[in-house]
Amino acid sequence: MYTVELGKLVEKMNLENCTPEIDISSIQITQPDVNRPALQLTGFFDYFDSDRVQIIGNVEHAYMQKMEKDHGLGIMKKLMSFKMPCIVFCRGIEVSEDFKEVAIEEGVPIFRTEKTTSSFMAEVIRWLKVELAPRISIHGVLVDVYGEGILIMGESGIGKSEAALELIKRGHRLVTDDLVEIKKVSDDTLIGTAPDITRHFIELRGIGIIDVKTLFGVESVKNTQSIDLVIKLEEWNRDKEYDRLGLEEQYIEFLGNRVVCHNIPIRPGRNLAVICESAAVNYRQKKMGYNAAQELYNRVTNNLLKKSK
């Protein structure tokens, strides 16, 4: 299970700390979802998702304001007796002194934001989904080509980094070389990024390590990119049948998500950068509803039907 420090969330969302007396350095968030404790304020604590970040909006605050003081204090103590990362008040709602006292007593940090409840929840969930996403690391190169994330794979020394360097010279952007960290942020989205230690570097055999950001400028690099297409480079095999039409897509699976994969045989004289660019544009065309292979198939079929009449 992956975790993210509460302090990182506070910094990212620019939250105001209403209980600075509480040390948050050891508090970890483990759940990407959030919870609005509406039913819990009425005293119903069955199925309470206390391990999530708790959000208080106008509705919850208005209900607490109408409670009798003793009853309200009892509900607050019961609520914060559960182990939770924190409670966030949205819309700039003022936190009562009674609420702060109970929070400090129970060790539950309280924060505040000026953002609306729904927009804050959406922003937090989206960020936590990425931070807490399941992940793997694979050997390869990830490049942004015309907005499509191209993951170049293949055996060591086959030319992945050289292909990436040529793509960079042609105006495309490097995400990571050699090691790709892949996160599954949804059932149809994979995000690739570089380890901090190797970010923006490329290794070229015979030359060594080069800093792409320094050599080609900030426009030549990118920190993250969705993985839309995989290109697997392999040595040319005369006995192997390679796809020449592209009517049927081949796929590779990462973390349960399937990604379109093209096996590209390597021979002297083949321009890998142009092949990668063509694959990216063709993939985008297919997403927009046009399939060149299907169009050719339809033309041939129609031509044969005409001749048979």
From Swiss-Prot:
Pfam families: Hpr_kinase_C, Hpr_kinase_N. ATP binds at G154, E155, S156, G157, I158, G159, K160, S161. It is an enzyme of class 2 (transferase). It catalyses: [HPr protein]-L-serine + ATP = [HPr protein]-O-phospho-L-serine + ADP + H(+); [HPr protein]-O-phospho-L-serine + phosphate + H(+) = [HPr protein]-L-serine + diphosphate. The active site is at H139, K160, D178 (proton acceptor), R244. Its cofactor is Mg(2+). It comes from the Bacteria. Keywords: ATP-binding, Carbohydrate metabolism, Kinase, Magnesium, Metal-binding, Multifunctional enzyme, Nucleotide-binding, Serine/threonine-protein kinase, Transferase. CDD domains: HprK_C (cd01918). Residues 202-211 are annotated as: Important for the catalytic mechanism of both phosphorylation and dephosphorylation. SUPFAM superfamilies: HprK N-terminal domain-like, PEP carboxykinase-like. Its EC number is 2.7.11.-, 2.7.4.-. The keyword Ribonucleoprotein does not apply. Mg(2+) binds at S161, E203. GO terms for molecular function: ATP binding; magnesium ion binding; phosphorelay sensor kinase activity; protein serine/threonine kinase activity; protein serine/threonine/tyrosine kinase activity. HAMAP family: HPr_kinase (MF_01249). Belongs to the HPrK/P family. The Walker A ATP-binding motif also binds Pi and PPi. Both phosphorylation and phosphorolysis are carried out by the same active site and suggest a common mechanism for both reactions. Catalyzes the ATP- as well as the pyrophosphate-dependent phosphorylation of a specific serine residue in HPr, a phosphocarrier protein of the phosphoenolpyruvate-dependent sugar phosphotransferase system (PTS). HprK/P also catalyzes the pyrophosphate-producing, inorganic phosphate-dependent dephosphorylation (phosphorolysis) of seryl-phosphorylated HPr (P-Ser-HPr). Homohexamer. This is HPr kinase/phosphorylase. The gene is hprK.
